[in-house]
Amino acid sequence: MISKKLIIELLKQLISFKSVTPNDNGAIDFITNLLVKQGFKVYVKEFGQEYKVKNLYGYFGNGQPNICFAGHIDVVPAGFIEQWKYPPFCATQYKDKIYGRGVVDMKGAISAMLSSVFCFIDNNHDFNGTISFLITADEEGEALFGTKKMLEWIYRQGHKIDFTILGEPTCTDKIGDTIKIGRRGSINFDLKVFGKQGHVAYPHLAINPNHLIVKILNRLIAYKIDEGNEFFAPSNLEIVSIDTNNNITNIIPEIAKSKFNIRFNDIHTNERLLEIVKKTIEQFTTNYDLQSSCRSRPFLAKMSPYIFSFKELVHKVTKIKPEFSTSGGTSDAYFFKDYSPIVEFGLLNTMAHKINEYCLINDLQTLCRVYYNALCLFLMSNSKFRTN
């Protein structure tokens, strides 16, 4: 049986590290020590320029398949501390819940991974293959010196990962209802439309950039980018800001600005979307400046037997039939697409990044059972599912 006490104790210890991205604040060393005591070979690598980000890769066992548990130990800031019921970096257990920043995203999943792996190793000395961990402290921010760099390093050393389970909070209503097998891309736009400043009483002597930018944005909103496909919802544009920096009521400003984002599926490339946006703008004006940045592109995991077997496993353990999904924000799963098949499966995502972030203890235990049985399925020749 996977120890409930161990799961909770590990989570409380992980929450105690104020690991606001990209500072792990000692959490990577803590996990390293746990893995080394269990017999893992662990490498801690630092990447970055002005600020060094810690990452770890540890493995136990030999040969293939290599089943990798991946995740991030960094968290978003706690926000207004006075709004929390309990101190955000001092995990509090109250009734059937555990509160703390990062409980859901994603220290809860990491504690479940560690607990289930340690239990599996203690109870199965003759398994075939390798168990590994890839943990970063750079996911919630720029994600420049975390998983991406670590995967490059791992493969330069000759290691091969056969299947990855990333513990992002994926489930919606109950543990088991959603498995992420891909993610949408995200492209940000920063638009400036130039007009001609003037007095509001003499509009014929000015060019109002507000009128132009409103027309442009309305046209972009009305534009149907695509219909979606089997695994992806339709691409979606959202306006996030409109501004002129003008507080004077009798002046027509010279510049109007807007920022907007498109979450897009694998029907499009970011270059194609940039072309669409430019053509739309130029229906109304050529006097503009447009900057764009694409942090992540859409991807769909390699649909290997590992992924379909994992889906069946989740159904057997949780008694819930999971759906494959590509919804939600971006994650480090994108970086694995060229290295191994990957699924994202973790806790409920409803409390991620929120004040009073919490998870149910029963959900942690269910997640442990899924992770444990995944190891049984992929590493034991005569695997049997555990329900406790």
UniProtKB/Swiss-Prot annotation:
Cofactor note: Binds 2 Zn(2+) or Co(2+) ions per subunit.
Active site feature: D74, E139 (proton acceptor)
BP-aspect Gene Ontology terms: diaminopimelate biosynthetic process; L-arginine biosynthetic process; lysine biosynthetic process via diaminopimelate
Uppermost EC category: hydrolase
EC annotation from Swiss-Prot or TrEMBL: 3.5.1.18
Known cofactor(s): Zn(2+); Co(2+)
CDD domains: M20_DapE_proteobac
Family note: Belongs to the peptidase M20A family. DapE subfamily.
General function of this protein: Catalyzes the hydrolysis of N-succinyl-L,L-diaminopimelic acid (SDAP), forming succinate and LL-2,6-diaminopimelate (DAP), an intermediate involved in the bacterial biosynthesis of lysine and meso-diaminopimelic acid, an essential component of bacterial cell walls.
Subunit structure: Homodimer.
Protein name: Succinyl-diaminopimelate desuccinylase
The species this protein was found in: Orientia tsutsugamushi (strain Boryong) (Rickettsia tsutsugamushi)
Lineage: Bacteria, Pseudomonadati, Pseudomonadota, Alphaproteobacteria, Rickettsiales
